[in-house]
């Protein structure tokens, strides 16, 4: 079985004597014969998904990295000569390429890119890296698609070297020469470095620390391969959208390995779900005790930094300066992940009892059958190059929209699918490149209320304004770059998405919306990084049955997915039930295991909860509320609690039918919001008749438009948001989205 990266030193075969982690292990039990059999079955199940790379491809990567390393050494010698360094220094000046990320961890998949770091001595400037080294790469015949992103948060050179995509960061150390045996984990290397170099070094330092903090690297790698595949298949692998990225999943698996140091992969996968389905967030996950290096770098510490108290699911990197790798997680994304952990525990319980096979764990749930209501975001650009830039910007802001939606008092959950899809063209005769994302919505059951309106117009419009402004400020914006949103019922999704994505071959009514058909073959789900999610599929052509992690099946009454300006959609609220997964049924007596929480910070009283008023007039925000998030359960042990995040306030932005939509709206404290009430399923148990009224704000007449014509017709000038830089004198046209849902009892 291939393990694609050489390990750091030999791994001990005897049960480890060293203590790993910040708590004692839960169990030191050695693997049984049945565990070995299950592990082999796990390996066989993983193979069709392409998670293992062939030895030939591995050697090709090693050869390419060797060539790149030689180029770096040659380039640094040339720079040294041009700066008139002594010959004795030039001969030993060194320079080296380090790797990090999935390749360094040894868990990269077939065709995955390589994250690399170029380390240079003190006399080599960053400007040299982006000029002379860039020019040197350009001369290499194996190098294609060379591009520099010098102004990025972490500056990078991207290239394709002999068919392998590589991202190269740069760090200049305060050393005269770079020795071959340099250990980047040495904190003293960070002294006198600029912040860009520290950021560039962070990836390597974190990856190397993780590998040094696990008892057995091979067991860690196989377990991480399985968990990463599971996360991708279940649409919860995306740091940028508020789920977890590769390094976060690696740290969760590493913590599991520390708690069960002698266990092998089959056991570790099960224990992973056991530990994190019971974890008392927001207690942080730590692989080692944080160390202070007195370098005055900002580190994650909720005792010192009030903003750190808002983090809902902290997973702390082990290398200084310690950071929370999951600061993007929201109430909704955490709830989705916790429910998936519980479902994973239930499935692995069955596997250990020989009631199910490993393939069941990797069955993909059908996101498009899970919810009754969806928001579809569409981004379009006139060229493919512009589309790539535009899509990257829009995707990086979607989590802000999700955070805004979940603060609506009538929205229980806003679940974004990390996959993006090609969208039908607005004008078949016009060259246009379009991408869409889908957000599933769950509405709370309304009590003793009638005709409550859920107005999402402000949230959508402020989101589009934010995206446009950043595009303008970064000089990325082009005239034909557009973004729009629409409310879509589940029954209408087939007109936006191809059948093989929906996984449901059922005849649907086409009444209400007509969209250009999508070409199934145009779907591209091959992107694989922390921020762009891919969904590996087994090489066999067998179709997996959708695994609905929450067992939901919603109603199918169908409105038009696009609504006219100032239109109102009437829906009935459905009761939200909480699916409970009985994690105490885990095999091997695991139900009685106490999961040690890793928080060591003393409890701190959070600052007073804000009561913020805001005035909404179309899209103008006055006195914007601070970013906040929903409350989460903390550990019962007061000595190990961290400050509870400030409870997210719910917007009462949905006036009664008779109220004016422009009426002043206030935010109220939601002191009793319980994350456990955010259910993913059970909507159909109280499913009632739904009716759709589409009425304009002036004529009250029913109007149905096609999605394409809607996007062309709803364009107005965007107004200003007080917390965002103003638009230029001639504001660009922004698609106005009026999405109002009326909840009827």
UniProtKB/Swiss-Prot annotation:
GO cellular component, as recorded: cytoplasm; nucleoplasm; nucleus
One Pfam family it belongs to: PAP_RNA-bind
Sequence segments annotated as region (Ser/Thr-rich): 508-643
Record-listed cross-link Glycyl lysine isopeptide (Lys-Gly) (interchain with G-Cter in SUMO), residues: 444-445, 506-507, 736, 740
Residues annotated as site: Interaction with RNA: 153, 158, 328, 399, 524
Amino-acid positions noted as binding ATP in the UniProt annotation, renumbered to this chain: 100-102, 109, 113-115, 167, 228, 237, 246-247
Described purpose of this protein according to its UniProt entry: Polymerase that creates the 3'-poly(A) tail of mRNA's. Also required for the endoribonucleolytic cleavage reaction at some polyadenylation sites. May acquire specificity through interaction with a cleavage and polyadenylation specificity factor (CPSF) at its C-terminus.
Family: Belongs to the poly(A) polymerase family.
Name of the protein: Poly(A) polymerase alpha
Name of the coding gene: PAPOLA
